[in-house]
Amino acid sequence: MRLCTAGRLKQLQGGLVNKAIEIKKLGQLEVLKASVPYTQDPTRLFHTICENKTDSLLLESAEIDSKQNLKSLLIVDSAVRIVCYGHTVSFHALTENGKNLLTHVNQNVRGEVASQFDGETLTLEFIQPCDTIDEDSRLREASSFDALRLVQHSFDLSSQDKHAIFLGGLFAYDLVANFEPLGDAVATNQCPDYVFYVAETLLVVDHQTESCQLQATLFVDGSQKAALESRIEDIRAQCTSPKRLPDATQVANITAQPSVPDQDFCQIVRDLKEFVVKGDIFQVVPSRRFTLPCPSPLAAYKELKQSNPSPYMFYMQDELFTLFGASPESALKYETDTNQIEIYPIAGTRRRGKRPNGEIDFDLDSRIELELRSDKKENAEHMMLVDLARNDVARISQAGTRHVADLLKVDRYSHVMHLVSRVVGQLRDDLDALHAYQACMNMGTLTGAPKIRAMQLIRDVEGARRGSYGGAVGYLTGEGTLDTCIVIRSAYVENGIAQVQAGAGVVFDSDPQAEADETRGKAQAVISAIQAAHSQPANKE
């Protein structure tokens, strides 16, 4: 039988499971709730309530086929910012409520983990996992993932809302380098290995029922209750009349500059094919960056949402960067209620069939789909990644529960169509969603197979950290649910400059120019959205 949340907490309290956490006492929570007027456009809510405030996050979902909005989750205020660099994790209290949270969770850190706490910042130092022990044992070693578990498990959730503890944020692609020997790489931006926010005020917008609920979580005691009640009234008032987005800063003749020109990228593809011929790998996914001005990222995100609605859409406003995107692909999903773990591999891409005026030519589009489904190379590449997903899911699932729920479907987006599949299983009783993510990172569609060797080759040819690209953005709840998407079809923005990164799967019979073209095709939806947003007024309905 599956361990419920309380069962997991008992194990942690007894010190039987976790080497970094010892629950000495469960803290108390109080969740304050209020209904607010429904708004169809969450970007207007974000602009109205958050504007330029950092440590805020908007997560949105849409139905794949109809493109209808489903739900939007907005972290308005964060109590704590959790940031990981290498094996060092720092918790920064952003409010008095956040200080109360840190004071409590600090009591539950095991003595074996080096820690320092000054009342506002808690720093944990983890050690490099031993690479001589087996994979299962490595999952149980103390690691930077335990910093997130510390918040998850330090409070009594027995009678609380599922979002009472809500952590939203980003796992960078390079987080895996803390666990696997990938080699050195330079940084092209300031992206940490991960950054998560513990929500203090959370806005939940249900587009199906056209309802909107605001909640605030009071940690440990009631000392900040009056302040939170006042903040709720503040936000409610702002939600009654959401402001239109201001006009985006106009930029003339925006062009995207590739980090690697076509000729050089083609040579990278040829070089990597040699490793396929030698049998080192079956597939590898090199990428390149396209940079362009993006002084108004929220306007660009709104344009991207309208032009390329996707199952996962996100806008993250950190103190170091802004990240936005419309991703077609789930990274890893775990639902506590069903105990199901899920990976959604996407591989096999074609441009949409369009007329010269840009409208979809449905007859041409259908013929392109047929050609995609019939392409032996694309099918072989896709099935290779389905097998990789099957292996990943099998390692963390109960015996006999892993299966392929969907195989070789076609999902359509504004500029491209993809072959997609879905692999599911029942998570083992001795693991949680973070164990599952650690075991599976990074997703095979952004690495190749075998995964570790492919990631090493990617480091060799790219020479730089990928940062957010190929990582995962999403949320984790106190009761254990994890929902993340792969950070693709996205823009990472620092100092008004966007980095749009895209890759292509290289196999034995890859055509170098076709792979270079594929990176442009995948990046185009985001590039076009940035260009469109900065060449016209943003405040359209």
Swiss-Prot record:
Gene for this chain:
trpE
> Which cysteines are cross-linked by disulfides?
none
The cofactor named in the record is:
Mg(2+)
Do you know which NCBIfam families this protein is assigned to?
PRK13564.1, trpE_proteo
Please give the Gene Ontology molecular function terms for this protein. Answer: anthranilate synthase activity; metal ion binding
InterPro entries reported for this sequence: ADC_synthase (IPR005801), Anth_synth_I-like (IPR019999), Anth_synth_I_N (IPR006805), Anth_synth_I_TrpE (IPR005257), Chorismate_C (IPR015890)
Protein name per the record: Anthranilate synthase component 1
Presence of keyword Amino-acid biosynthesis: yes
- Keywords on record: Amino-acid biosynthesis, Aromatic amino acid biosynthesis, Lyase, Magnesium, Metal-binding, Tryptophan biosynthesis
Cite the PANTHER family for this sequence: AMINOBENZOATE/ANTHRANILATE SYNTHASE, ANTHRANILATE SYNTHASE COMPONENT 1
Record-listed Mg(2+) binding positions: E381, E518
Q: What is its EC number?
A: 4.1.3.27
What is the role of the protein in this entry?
A: Part of a heterotetrameric complex that catalyzes the two-step biosynthesis of anthranilate, an intermediate in the biosynthesis of L-tryptophan. In the first step, the glutamine-binding beta subunit (TrpG) of anthranilate synthase (AS) provides the glutamine amidotransferase activity which generates ammonia as a substrate that, along with chorismate, is used in the second step, catalyzed by the large alpha subunit of AS (TrpE) to produce anthranilate. In the absence of TrpG, TrpE can synthesize anthranilate directly from chorismate and high concentrations of ammonia.
| Superkingdom assignment | Bacteria
Catalytic activity, as annotated: chorismate + L-glutamine = anthranilate + pyruvate + L-glutamate + H(+)
* Positions with a binding annotation for chorismate: G348, T349, Y469, R489, G503, A504, G505
> Self-association or partners: how does it assemble?
Heterotetramer consisting of two non-identical subunits: a beta subunit (TrpG) and a large alpha subunit (TrpE).
User: Is Metal-binding a UniProt keyword of this protein?
Assistant: yes
Listed pathway(s): Amino-acid biosynthesis; L-tryptophan biosynthesis; L-tryptophan from chorismate: step 1/5
Note accompanying the cofactor annotation: Binds 1 Mg(2+) ion per subunit.
Instruction: Summarize the activity regulation.
Output: Feedback inhibited by tryptophan.
In which organism is this protein found?
Answer: Vibrio parahaemolyticus serotype O3:K6 (strain RIMD 2210633)
